[in-house]
């Protein structure tokens, strides 16, 4: 008998009201509409210019790196990305539902007998560090998001991990 109930969550617009990048845009005074308009044009641009098909859900990561390297996101590194986790606007009841679902089964005698438990996982095209910096992490088993590699010398985001 399997004893783990795995709950898999998306992050943006599922757990939070908006996008995890919103506080970054605000801090760096970058217009989110303009940023996403630029990003949404990239798949067509690369298809026409280089005959390359890019993933429209993740091409924004390259744009974030370009902005960091050009100074628009000056000093943006993994530590800063993690700190933005504290500024995410969770929907009402989140993160309490993470704790509640785990505790609920601990108090059930049948679940105790069979060691049935709930585990929470987050799958996102967002920044792993941004999620890692949230208050959810005490109740999340794992995250599948994007890791960014920092430039060794300049300590800003530089590559997709």
Regions found by a protein language model. Name each.
Residues 2-153:
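Alpha-helical substrate-recognition element adjacent to the catalytic core
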Residues 152-161:
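A recognition module on extended beta-rich or small alphabeta surfaces enriched in W/G with H and D/E
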């Amino acid at each position: 008998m399997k004893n783990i109930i795995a709950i898999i969550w998306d992050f943006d617009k599922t757990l939070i009201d908006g996008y995890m990048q919103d506080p970054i845009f605000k801090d760096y005074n970058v217009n989110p509409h303009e940023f996403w308009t630029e990003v949404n044009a990239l798949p067509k641009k690369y298809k026409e210019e280089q005959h390359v098909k890019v993933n429209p859900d993740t091409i924004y990561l390259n744009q974030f790196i370009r902005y960091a390297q050009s100074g628009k996101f000056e000093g943006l590194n993994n530590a800063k990305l993690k700190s933005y986790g504290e500024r995410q606007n969770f929907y009402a009841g989140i993160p309490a539902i993470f704790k509640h679902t785990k505790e609920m089964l601990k108090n059930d005698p049948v679940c105790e007998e069979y060691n049935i438990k709930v585990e929470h996982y987050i799958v996102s095209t967002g920044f792993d560090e941004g999620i890692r910096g949230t208050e959810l992490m005490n109740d999340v088993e794992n995250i599948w998001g994007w890791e960014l590699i920092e430039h060794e010398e300049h300590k800003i985001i530089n590559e997709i991990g």
